[in-house]
Swiss-Prot record:
Organism, as annotated: Arabidopsis thaliana (Mouse-ear cress)
Domain Protein kinase, first and last residues per copy: 27-307
Region: Disordered, residue numbers: 859-903, 1037-1064
Cited PROSITE patterns: HEAT_REPEAT, PROTEIN_KINASE_DOM, PROTEIN_KINASE_ST, WD_REPEATS_2, WD_REPEATS_REGION
Subunit composition and interactions: Interacts with VPS34. Component of a complex made of VPS38/USL1 and PI3K main subunits such as VPS15, ATG6/VPS30 and VPS34.
HEAT repeat copies, ranges: 383-421, 480-517, 524-562, 610-646, 648-685, 687-724, 727-764
Protein name: Serine/threonine-protein kinase VPS15
Keywords: ATP-binding, Autophagy, Cytoplasm, Endosome, Golgi apparatus, Kinase, Lipoprotein, Membrane, Myristate, Nucleotide-binding, Phosphoprotein, Protein transport, Repeat, Serine/threonine-protein kinase, Transferase, Transport, WD repeat
GO process annotations (BP): late endosome to vacuole transport; macroautophagy; pollen development; pollen germination; protein transport
Length: 1494
């Protein structure tokens, strides 16, 4: 094919290249490739992609091309049988009258182009390409095919470094003349540079001894020589081994290429190349022999068969599947590459003992993958992603830069020694990385991942690809990290998916600190490349991305700082800023290179700090700042201080700190005071005392215990480091000491730690001079050493309520009061201070008793006098100095009422003196509910014990407080470790946290306490001991006798009466309409109020949740909602607000729980304006069990986090810990009982009751998560609503300690049930309505069985599956739809009769209708009568004048339409209350109206 033509006519017009080609090929010329003279190469567009067309133009005599076509057919057919080919023959050819066309697929890159393209090939990549080139030649020679023109242009490469050998030259001459270079230039010189890859034996001389035919067959040794030339050029960075003249000289023995090959550092590669280019063809080995002989010398062992087989399996897969499979076997790839390294590679610390993964294992893995779908494969591999990174976590930790690790308290000393506040720069060495982490084979995996990452369709697989790149970056060199991996990671910072952007950010911040060295061209990578690409992240629409940026900004800043320092080191050795000697000699001393460099370095550092400061300010104070972003930024505030230095930390960081505290998020405030200690160490002593200590002082009166504790721990750290001056330290002690009586043990321990640290800092003399007088009133006795935490804890008096503590704080803010108090502290004698509180207690006794109008008032006063007289005895005074104080109890106490002393201590302002508000005989007790007053204490005491305290008794009781001040009694030894009970002493009963010792069955005492949010690990053992004594730890406020408390089953507990959750006792709404809110377009199903009653939210069927400002209810005439949250088309079924937060949880009809936070700035002191800035979406949880039916707050104890209990349409009951996405537990109700329509939980969190849509009520024990009791409501109807019953204190404990609940079901009736036995106590009902049933028809007293003993199978199936309901669904009975419990057992109800009623528990006849329509001619002449039937009390509302007919729904609606008092005009769906200047009632109805009453 053209071997006999000397030259052809030059074709100049490219439009004629495809003129003779049939139009069926659909080819469009794109550009001309190369400078070939024999074949013209052009790039064309085809319907299926780009192709390369090589055109041969016929000139002169006609030539028969059929022989060459036969050779092309043979080559194509032979290579079709290859399983994993490295050869790429021509795919199509066409001969016309004027030309011949050869067509193959276009490849973006060949070896010649790749050698000059960044990122440049690494050593292992070059070996991998050489390995594949030998494999390609081996495949050809095994099929008896020789290429004939192997050169860099004919070696094609994919983006993942898979090699193909193309453009087989079966139509080119085998031999060419030695003395005529024209043939060489015509056939083989495509670049015009006269580079020669032909074997020497392919040149012949005219007239020589041996005559050869130009078309003689090619030999394999000729291809081996060309392969050697290509491999040499590969390792010589693109420099050719031979030009034509050099090759001819080498043929004559006049040229030695070994000198040129000395530039290759690997001797094994040089040896292999020299062996391939020998002059003697017979001395050259076959391609297979070279592959076998140089394994372990040139080619790593894992190349074949492991890595090659792996690539063969990856080639046919799409990008998503490649990443998924790579992730699944990444560990095996790493192990295999780390084994048996070749050459001088450094091994790992210990050999890998696991079995190696061979080629068969790889093939089996991919074969199994092919059996599954792509989605299953991706799912299985993605689930194991954590296994990849656990194995390298230690490596990441070892190789992190020293100043990039988290700064701990122990590191502060070392960090401050590293930190030089004077120079403020250039003080840290650059990033060291250990060499044992090197694994050069990881570059190949990284290249494959980079080639796939742009084509991955699934976002989570793009994320996994980035994380795999992060893993590979641990084992590759710096150049590959910067040139190969980093550009792809940075490009994905603008990915449309948030999780991909977060992963790219994390990977970027993990890769950059690993860099040890970089070229001068990358010295400004941060200011010119990294920071501009990150500039949009502070305004990212997704909060998770901003959080990720904030959590990594400190690491990024310190890494940029390290890069800057390293660039200065490069300039020191003359790499950067080179100046010639003449310029230096003529430059003044002030402008020498060292001075210029230092000035330039300071300018660059200041610019870097300015850039980071702008980012921090945008994250903290920008328009898209959130509490979560701020919290993330605070986690590394110490590293930021280190980066900014002392001056800029004062100038920049200090002014933005108030922005953190202005946020209402309690978690943010807690983290702020946890991390503020790092700022203290960097800004200096003066800044701490002037700016930061006021913040800490403010935190001490915070509502959140974690904030208080973190502030105290910060102070303790500063004291232990001697960072505070004496004056500032004493001021903080005066601010802190009231917290010694705080009800939380966690806070008290933190206060004790601070006081002990302060004492150690001041010394013994100053401690007793300044600290002891301040804290003496809070201690039962003074410890031997104030610097001892254990001693202080053992001497602490019991805690008081939060209300008392906050009043003390208000007093301490008064300068006059503090001046008076200091005079008392430092002027009084020790004796007067010891008993000052006792005198004050006695002084207020009469006032306290006057408040409590009880029959036993006289006895109580006498008891106090006895206590006072006993306290005056010297023996009693000496008792406080004893270490082991014991409670003396007579062996046979007299059972008369005069021995009972009841101490009631409400809060009075005159008792809020530091020296007097804690009486020695007043102690706290374990508690679970909020009180309204100081704890109430009662104890039985024999007069002989009071008058003769030193007398020992066999009935002495030693009680251990077990670390809980609330469990201690002043007489009892706080350091005792066990109970020592004499056999004659009655077992003490702990009722609501108080101890009662006595035998009189009529002696009972009631104690209400403040909950302890933090208790130590010994609480559980204490509770278990009390339970062994027959005492319930969950008991609540109640009056208890020895009879009533004899049964442990009675001590179930009474609900908490929190000030914020339950209306005031005795509150009686008058029915005066305050506001009418009509923004909702459909039914308002539920209302929830905030903890501080500043706002409330409403959930509606119109797919919205609206936020209303409570403070404007009584002020604004036109009242509008402040914020609106949209539920994306689903109905809002139920809602609740998490306690002590602004977070709202809403259950929707599509089964999604929406959780969001309200950005609300409440009105405080000064000129603070109340503001609702927006809604922050926190999370959405799809339960996938149908609509949400019920939703309520759940609090097991004060230690648990915010939890929500909810029920679903598919009979599921779940407890969700809102801090995670998972349920804490899940229970399943019986489907045959219907779905769970209502829930009610106990305040202690030990039990709850569920009501179903078919009238089945079930009591569940949450300790074991099993149903305890289940009973059927008297009629089969849905349980509409349930709530707890708060009985009055006068009721006996046998009743109050049982789980009592109000149940709204049936037709206009509410019943009070004891869930323990399923018995009914009381029924509240409304008469004169249709569908009502006579009372006598129901068996209210005894619970109904759900299933008959031996039912008929057919009837059972019908009853179980309610088949009749499919044909005719039962109508929903009119009745009560909303309940609001009140203290004392009272109840507010609202229902379909459009009325809201108040039912009085103690005096049922005083019940009344708050609001509702009045029937024409009848008026409100309702009265309430009591009946009894089968032992159940019935309270029934009836008309004084009987109605002729029973009321119908139409009659009620007609009356509502004409009512002028503003009553509801549709069913009342929800009730709630808020406490402002007065208590207000909020009600919502099915027509979308919300009404506020007073």
């Amino acid at each position: 094919m053209g071997n006999k033509i000397a030259r052809t006519t030059q074709v100049s017009a490219t439009e004629y290249y495809l003129h003779d080609l049939p139009s069926s090929y659909n080819l469009v010329l794109k550009e001309v490739l190369g400078r070939g003279r024999f074949l013209k190469s052009i790039q064309c567009k085809h319907d299926e992609g780009l192709v390369v067309v090589k055109v041969y133009f016929k000139r002169g005599d006609s030539i028969d091309l059929r022989e060459y076509e036969r050779r092309l057919v043979k080559i194509k057919d032979v290579f079709l049988s290859l399983e994993h080919p490295h050869v790429w023959p021509f795919q199509f050819w066409q001969e016309t009258d004027k030309a011949a066309y050869l067509v193959r697929q276009y490849f973006y890159s060949n070896l010649h182009d790749r050698l000059s393209t960044r990122p440049f090939l690494s050593l292992v990549e070059k070996k991998w390409l050489a390995f594949q080139l030998l494999l390609a030649v081996k495949q050809c020679h095994e099929k008896d095919i020789c290429h004939g023109d192997i050169k860099c242009e004919n070696v094609l490469l994919t983006s993942w470094n898979w090699l193909y050998l193309a453009d087989f030259a079966s139509f080119k001459p085998t031999y060419i003349p030695y003395d005529d270079p024209s043939d060489f230039s015509f056939f083989f010189d495509t670049r015009g540079q006269r580079l020669c890859y032909l074997a020497p034996e392919r040149f012949y001389e005219h007239g020589g001894e041996t005559q050869v035919a130009q078309d003689a067959p090619l030999k394999p040794s000729m291809d081996i020589f060309a392969v050697g030339c290509v491999i040499a050029e590969l390792f010589l960075e693109g420099q050719p081994l031979f030009e034509l003249a050099q090759l001819l000289a080498y043929r004559r023995g006049q040229h030695d290429p070994s000198q040129h090959l000395e530039k290759i550092p690997d001797p094994g590669i040089r040896k292999m190349i020299l062996h391939m280019i020998q002059l003697e063809p017979e001395a050259r080995l076959s391609a297979e022999d070279y592959l076998q002989n140089y394994v372990g010398v040139v080619f790593p062992n894992y190349f074949s068969p492991f890595l090659h087989t792996l690539y063969c399996c990856w080639n046919p897969l799409p990008s998503d599947m490649r990443v998924a499979t790579c992730q699944g076997i990444f560990q095996e790839i790493l192990k295999k590459m780390m084994e048996n390294k070749s050459g001088d590679e450094i091994g790992v610390d210990s050999p890998v003992t696991s079995n190696p993964m061979n080629a068969s294992t790889v093939q089996e893995t991919f074969a199994n993958h092919k059996l599954n779908s792509s989605k299953d494969l991706i799912r299985n591999t993605v689930n194991s992603k954590d296994e990849i990174f656990y194995s390298i976590s230690d490596a990441l930790k070892k190789n992190r830069h020293p100043f990039l690790k988290k700064i701990t308290m122990d590191d502060l000393g070392t960090l401050m020694s590293l930190y030089d506040s004077r120079s403020d720069t250039y003080g840290t060495p650059f990033l060291p990385v250990e060499g044992n982490m090197r694994c050069e084979g990881m570059v190949l995996i990284a290249s494959m991942l980079c080639s796939c990452i742009r084509n991955i369709k699934l976002p989570h697989l793009r994320r996994e690809a980035i994380l795999l790149l992060r893993s590979c970056s641990l084992y590759i060199d710096d150049d590959d990290r910067l040139q190969r991996v980093l550009p792809y990671v940075v490009a994905l910072l603008s990915d449309p998916t948030a999780i991909v952007r977060c992963a790219a950010m994390e990977t970027l911040c993990d890769i950059l600190p690993l860099v040890r060295d970089f070229p001068p061209s990358d010295a400004k990578i941060f200011p010119e490349y990294i920071f501009p690409m990150l500039s949009m992240l502070p305004e990212d629409t997704e909060e998770s991305v901003r959080i990720c940026y904030a959590s990594n900004i400190a690491k990024l800043a310190l890494t940029a700082y390290g890069f800057l320092i390293h660039s200065f080191q490069l300039s020191d050795v003359g790499v950067l800023n080179e100046l010639n000697s003449q310029q230096i000699s003529t430059t003044p001393a002030s402008e020498t290179p060292s001075h210029l460099q230092k000035a330039n370095g300071n300018a660059q550092l200041q610019q870097l700090r300015k850039t980071i400061a702008e980012v921090v300010q945008e994250l903290v104070m920008g328009p898209k700042q959130t509490p979560n972003v701020r919290r993330a930024l605070l986690q590394d505030i110490g590293e930021l201080c280190f980066f900014f230095g002392q001056r800029q930390s004062n100038d920049f960081l200090l002014p933005i700190l108030p922005a953190f505290l202005n946020d209402r998020d309690e978690q943010l405030r807690s983290v702020f005071f946890e991390k503020i200690v790092y700022v203290c160490f960097f800004v200096g002593q003066r800044s701490v005392e002037e700016y930061l200590l006021p913040y800490i002082d403010q935190a001490l009166s915070d509502q959140t215990e974690a904030v208080i504790v973190n502030a105290l721990e910060c102070l303790s750290t500063l004291c232990k480091s001697s960072f505070l001056r004496k004056r500032a330290l004493l001021q903080m002690i005066e601010c802190v000491y009231p917290l010694l009586c705080y009800p939380s043990q966690w806070v008290r321990r933190a206060v004790v730690t601070f006081i002990a640290a302060s004492s150690e800092c001041l010394g013994a003399v100053d401690s007793y001079a300044f600290i002891a007088p301040v804290i003496r009133s809070y201690l039962s006795r003074l410890p031997a050493s104030i610097a001892s935490e254990e001693g202080l804890l053992s001497c602490l008096k019991p805690p008081v309520t939060r209300e008392v503590v906050y009043r003390i704080f208000e007093k301490t803010r008064n300068p006059e009061f503090m001046a008076k108090q200091r005079k008392m502290w430092y002027s009084s004698s020790p004796q007067s201070k010891d008993w000052e509180s006792v005198d004050l207690f006695d002084k207020d006794a009469g006032e306290l008793n006057s408040v409590e109008c009880r029959a036993e008032q006289k006895q109580s006063v006498e008891g106090k006098k006895q206590i006072k007289s006993a306290s005056k005895q010297p023996e009693v005074q000496g008792k406080y100095a004893e270490k082991d104080a014991k409670l003396r109890i007579p062996r046979n106490p007299r059972p008369n009422a005069s021995n009972t002393v009841e101490l009631r201590d409400p809060v009075y302002p005159e008792k809020l003196q530091f020296s007097g508000f804690m009486a020695p005989y007043v102690s706290g007790a374990n508690s679970f509910i909020e009180p309204e007053n100081i704890p109430l204490y009662s104890f039985s005491m024999d007069k002989r014990a009071a008058t003769n305290p030193p007398v020992a008794s066999e009935s002495s009781l030693q009680m251990n407080s077990l670390g809980m001040g609330s469990l201690s009694v002043p007489w009892m030894d706080s350091m005792s470790k066990s109970f020592n009970l004499a056999s004659s002493v009655p077992v003490p009963k702990l009722i609501s946290g108080s101890f009662h010792v006595g035998t009189n069955p009529k002696q009972f005492y009631r104690v209400v306490h403040e909950p302890e949010s933090r208790e130590n690990d010994q609480i559980s053992s204490a509770i278990s001991k009390f339970q062994d004594l027959g005492v319930s730890s969950s008991s609540k406020s109640a009056s208890v006798t020895s009879e009533d408390a004899s049964s442990p089953a009675d001590l179930v507990g009474e609900p908490s009466l929190s000030r914020t959750s339950v209306p005031d006792s005795g509150w009686k709404p008058r029915g005066v309409l305050v506001a009418h809110l009509q923004e909702h377009r459909s039914a308002v199903n539920d209302i929830a109020t905030s903890s501080d009653h500043s706002f409330f939210v409403s959930a509606s069927d119109d797919s919205t949740v609206k936020v209303w400002d409570s403070r404007k209810l009584e002020k604004d005439i036109s009242f509008r909602s402040r914020l609106t949250y949209h539920l994306e088309g689903s109905r809002g079924m139920c809602t609740t607000m998490l306690r002590n937060s602004t977070q709202v949880v809403v259950g929707a009809s599509d089964g999604v729980i929406h959780m969001f936070s309200i950005d609300h700035i409440s009105r405080g002191l000064g000129n603070v304006v109340e503001k609702y800035s927006g809604i922050v979406d926190i999370k959405k949880k799809d339960v996938k069990e149908g609509a949400l039916v019920s939703l309520l707050n759940y609090t097991a104890d004060s230690l648990s986090g915010p939890m929500v209990m909810y029920s679903t349409q598919n009979c599921g009951i779940h407890l969700w810990d809102t801090r995670s996405d998972l349920d804490a537990w899940t229970l399943k109700a019986n489907p045959e009982e219907g779905y769970v329509s209502s829930l009610v939980t106990s305040p202690c969190g030990n039990w709850f009751v569920s009501g179903s849509s078919r009238g089945v009520l079930t009591l569940w024990d949450l300790r074991f998560r099993v149903p305890v009791n289940s009973w059927q409501y008297p009629i089969i109807c849905p349980i509409e609503k349930m709530c707890l019953c708060f009985l009055p204190p006068s009721v006996s404990v046998s009743t109050t300690m049982k789980p009592l609940i109000y149940v709204a079901a049936g037709c206009n009736e509410v019943s009070l049930w004891n869930a323990e036995g399923g018995s009914c106590h009381q029924v509240l009902r409304v008469a004169n309505y249709e569908n009502e049933t006579d009372v006598s028809e129901f068996q209210w007293k005894l619970p109904s069985n759900k299933v008959n003993p031996k039912p008929n199978h057919r009837q059972n199936m019908s009853s179980k599956y309610r088949i009749e309901e499919l044909n005719e669904p039962p109508p929903r009975l009119p009745g009560i739809r909303s309940l609001l419990p009140l203290p004392g057992g009272d109840l507010l109800t609202g229902g379909t009769d459009l009325k809201i009623r108040r039912w009085d528990y103690s005096s049922p006849e005083r019940s009344y209708c708050i609001c509702g329509p009045s029937l024409k001619g009848v008026g409100n002449d309702d009265f309430y009568e009591l009946k009894t039937n089968t032992g159940v009390q019935f309270v029934q509302e009836t008309k004084r004048r009987p109605l002729a007919t029973k009321l119908t729904a139409k009659a009620v609606l007609a009356a509502a339409a004409t009512d002028t008092a503003g009553c509801h005009r549709d069913s009342v769906q929800s009730l709630a209350s808020v406490k402002l200047n007065q208590r207000l009632l909020i009600s919502s109805s099915r027509d979308g109206a919300i009404k506020v009453w007073k």
